Amino acid sequence: MIKWPWKVQESAHQTALPWQEALSIPLLTGLTEQEQSKLVTLAERFLQQKRLVPLQGFELDSLRSCRIALLFCLPVLELGLEWLDGFHEVLIYPAPFVVDDEWEDDIGLVHNQRIVQSGQSWQQGPIVLNWLDIQDSFDASGFNLIIHEVAHKLDTRNGDRASGVPFIPLREVAGWEHDLHAAMNNIQEEIELVGENAASIDAYAASDPAECFAVLSEYFFSAPELFAPRFPSLWQRFCQFYQQDPLQRLHRTNDTDSFSATNVH
């Protein structure tokens, strides 16, 4: 019998949190029992250290809080929760939100416009999310808003700005940049052939190195079968950085499903 650490009745608060139900989303089905236990331990600490702030009437219950915490902690399962030290609040809108955006064109003119955002990650500031896209992050589709924004936070640990190169040994930076830019070029070539909507990888990955790292981090965890065979060298670098192999988890899940199917009477 498995003794889950989060089932130990250390406090009324801990026993009230529905961790087992929170784990029952497609994205997390490939985790071993040991990985689930470790992830929940990190998520408990995350909820103790971070403040989840619902906005515009969004109702944040314990199950939603647990699932948000689990997704935040999945990328740092082996890195450690200290990798998420760069923020203290998570702001959660009920749906994509409108922000005022300021940008400068090629001749130096500054423009202001209102744009719809799914999420934002501020340097040494909060992470901003919306619940509709968080819900869409529970499956294994290649889209994951929380992992995308966490990747930006991990990226900025290597400097003042997100560059697409997380905090890795200096000797590995050149190889990482080479493989990341090769992936960007490959994605851009596909976009030019079939268009953004038909591309097999989110076209946003081709916009700049920081977004490429964030988008491919989404695919790394939620659609490894698309990432690994297409960019095998970069895949290995991601595995080394995150110290995880989601493709192995996927194969393990598929093997379990196949075994169960063959034993149905």
Swiss-Prot record:
The protein's predominant localisation is cytoplasm
SUPFAM superfamilies, alphabetically?
Metalloproteases ('zincins'), catalytic domain (SSF55486)
| EC class of the enzyme, as a word | hydrolase
Molecular function terms, GO-annotated: aminopeptidase activity; metallopeptidase activity; zinc ion binding
Task: Decide whether keyword Zinc is in the record.
Answer: yes
Co-factor requirement: Zn(2+)
| Record-linked InterPro entries | MetalloPept_cat_dom_sf, MtfA_enterob, MtfA_fam, MtfA_N
List the record's Gene Ontology CC terms alphabetically: cytosol
Which UniProt keywords are present, listed alphabetically?
Aminopeptidase, Cytoplasm, Hydrolase, Metal-binding, Metalloprotease, Protease, Zinc
Which parts of the sequence bind Zn(2+)? Answer: 111, 148, 152, 211
Its annotated compartments are:
Cytoplasm
An example Pfam family from this entry, by short name, is Peptidase_M90
Chain's role: Involved in the modulation of the activity of the glucose-phosphotransferase system (glucose-PTS). Interacts with the transcriptional repressor Mlc, preventing its interaction with DNA and leading to the modulation of expression of genes regulated by Mlc, including ptsG, which encodes the PTS system glucose-specific EIICB component. Shows zinc-dependent metallopeptidase activity.
Complexes and interactors: Interacts with Mlc.
Q: What's the name of the protein?
A: Mlc titration factor A
